[in-house]
Amino acid sequence: MVVIGGAATVMTRHRGQSFAIWGTLGYFTVMEALQVAGYRVLDQCGTSSNQAVTLLSYLHIAFQPLFINAFAMELVPEPVKLRFRLWVFGLCAASSVIMLAQLIPAPAFGSCTPGSPLCGDALCTVSGNWHIAWDIPYNGLLVPVDAAFGTRFGFPSYMITVFVLPLLYGAWRFVLLHLVSGPILAWTLTNNPNEMPAVWCLFSIVIVLAGLSPFFRRSISSGTWWGVRV
């Protein structure tokens, strides 16, 4: 996957594609590299190398909404992208800040809910059912938000910016594809909430396909804003 992602990044940049396309491919290729690194330090909890890989993996996830939305906005009409992009990037940046704040070990915030994605007692990359899993001791800053919606996302700001925000500018085809090939597929392949995000990231190959294939990209693009010509 690292080789495929790297080749896709170089190819799309060579073709003159926008940074939103090849930059997103490159960013998710970094995640594949982090997963390879995770296997080299697997279950070595307490070591600086394992903790570094785990923390970098979390930080990568925290900033994914920026790249996912940059990619998704390439799939909608240019006037729509220009009208929404500042708000979109602002909200994605806010989500990233919130996810960074969830790492603050503040007793006042409490702790994450056991069974929520990535929730763990100590920072460590460990063995999942068949893939790697990440244990992150994040705080309970957003537990009340999850409780209000009756969910256990752990990171509701991420879910909103990745799956709800693109709907506002009309990238519904991409959202549907991402939902099916991401969390839904991941949950069918593992019941481990700490392994699921790593499996989800593993299948970022779908974004690679969308970046490489003009036909595939057209099939998930929208020529209107919810049926309205702009």
Region locations from a protein language model:
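Internal transmembrane alpha-helix with an interfacial aromatic "cap," most often the third helix
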Residues: G6-V10, L34-T47, Y58-G90, M99-I104
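Structural signal for the C-terminal ends of transmembrane alpha-helices
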Residues: A7-R15, F71-V80, P166-W172, L212-R217
